[in-house]
Amino acid sequence: MNDFGIKNMDQVAPVASSYRGTLKRQAAFDTFDGSLLAVFPSLNEEQTLQEVPTGLDSISHDSANCELPLLTPCSKAVMSQALKATFSGFKKEQRRLGIPKNPWLWTEQQVCQWLLWATNEFSLVDVNLQRFGMTGQVLCNLGKERFLELAPDFVGDILWEHLEQMIKENQEKNEDQYEENSHLNSVPHWINSNSLGFGVEQAPYGMQTQSYPKGGLLDGLCPASSAPSTLGPEQDFQMFPKARLNTVSVNYCSVGQDFPAGSLNLLSSASGKPRDHDSAETGGDSFESSESLLQSWNSQSSLLDVQRVPSFESFEDDCSQSLGLSKPTMSFKDYIQDRSDPVEQGKPVIPAAVLAGFTGSGPIQLWQFLLELLSDKSCQSFISWTGDGWEFKLADPDEVARRWGKRKNKPKMNYEKLSRGLRYYYDKNIIHKTSGKRYVYRFVCDLQNLLGFTPEELHAILGVQPDTED
């Protein structure tokens, strides 16, 4: 045995003579020891050999009573495909109930509807819906660990995977649209003081803005065009707050059909501090406050106005509100009837919060709030329909402004600020001022298709009598 080892060492690794004897003996010993190990394999090697072909020894003794075997990569892929096929069934439910595709936009009611669907689809038991009494934005911000704590045992991973899948699909859609649309060029030095108090510095001649990506109804009404619209110097920019920002750069990220609140990236930098009276209290909502109605129920000419620069309300509420671009497949009237908690007697026929959830517009917007007041009999002393179609009158504009400020948590709201929000709707063809009549306005968008009521039907419900006052 030693001779065999010595010969091999002489051939492979000749060394200095002073160390030759020691190395030869060590090599021979290693060879002998290796031969013994080859004859008597260790217990660990036996276990390793068993684990490779069967995989059974990887299961601990504590899991001997498990009903299901461990998932292999192959079985996981099959399971994932099966879950995706099951999840696709929720899309029909979304269309039926008017639930936005983007979970970030869900109301508490829509979160509950999703869980009810999952309960029926997966035959779940002991599901505590009260634990999920939250909006979609709060739900998506929970994180997986916190979500699993609230979810029923053994199915939390499935529900979380479904939620992640819907969010991912929405993000991918936004990214695809983003690649097809360039950013709006940054425009410095927009805002400057003037006699009106909140005008802007005249925009440069030929300033261009890129159109937003269109989705749903927009694709049919407004064919995509690579030519950008051009803003001339004569256009009205009298809608920015004075001294709100000295220098503003506006950067628009692409807006998909649905996207989480906050993803509209309006970045502004100020070189000076705003004054106290120039706080974020404005009469209207943010730039997207009218777009959900425009992009689903308005005319082509009005839809083209979406390409314009944002109004002064764009900087309100930290620019966190999102566009509602999806068109529900049913009217608001049908939506209310399908709800498990119909509108109570004595309450507004058109609650603003429910209407906001129906249109997927996010926070309550001014036009939605006005419809709530107009559909509430208890508010007819200060705002009411005139009886002439969708025309309405502010009998007490200060009270309307006060209530709007209370709803938006803006105690300094007044009619002057409210009227600025109303004027923003003029060129969007949502609300127009009735000429020759003080405090009289008219909805000029297609409210009938949106609400499912004709003006006469709504007037009859509310007991409205035609206004004979000139």
Curated annotation (Swiss-Prot):
Maturation and modification: Phosphorylation by CDK10 at Ser-225 may create a phosphodegron that targets ETS2 for proteasomal degradation.
Protein name: Protein C-ets-2
PROSITE patterns given in the database record: ETS_DOMAIN_1 (PS00345), ETS_DOMAIN_2 (PS00346), ETS_DOMAIN_3 (PS50061), PNT (PS51433)
Region: Disordered, residue numbers: 270-291
Keywords for this protein: DNA-binding, Nucleus, Phosphoprotein, Proto-oncogene, Transcription, Transcription regulation
Gene: ETS2
Main location per the UniProt record: nucleus
Any GO MF annotation of the entry: DNA-binding transcription factor activity, RNA polymerase II-specific
UniProt KW Nucleus keyword: yes
Signal peptide stretch: none
